[in-house]
Design a protein with these regions (language model features):
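Conserved thiamine diphosphate
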Residues: 1-130
Length: 130
């Protein structure tokens, strides 16, 4: 809704494992908005979702579900691997005119260390480094 009227909403799913009930809306609605409207509409939506195992999350908190979305036309998937990439990819995700799934590995939220850029940094999608 908000993305359709000029806003750039950022949604956060507590765990990526819980995104599955929203799969139809993400793939069939948001990702195809530009195509369905013949380029008249865009859907600048960023969805953040921590994913992955190795953090003692158990059965429902350890899945890596990014492959479910990876082949969806109109949807961009980003997974940062460094603090530097995390900042740049998040800013680029927010500025994108198409929906972006911003997956963060749960381990990276606590254990990843490194420097991020002090300046405003933008990453180009489809490149490995900012």
């Amino acid at each position: 809704g908000a993305a359709m009227v000029g806003k750039r909403p950022i949604a956060e799913i507590q765990f990526a494992d819980f995104i599955l009930p929203a799969t139809n809306q993400i793939i069939s609605e948001a990702a195809k908005m530009r195509y369905r409207s013949n380029n008249d509409w865009q859907c600048p939506l960023t969805i953040r979702a921590p994913f992955g195992g190795g953090v003692h999350g158990g059965l429902y908190h350890s899945q890596s579900i990014e492959s479910i979305f990876a082949s969806s036309p109109g949807l961009t998937i980003v997974i940062p691997s460094t603090p530097y990439d995390a900042k740049g990819l998040l800013l680029s995700s927010i500025e994108s005119n198409d929906p972006v799934l911003y997956f963060e590995h749960k381990k990276s939220l606590s254990f990843l260390k490194g420097r991020s850029a002090r300046r405003i940094l933008h990453c180009t999608f489809r490149k490995s480094r900012c």
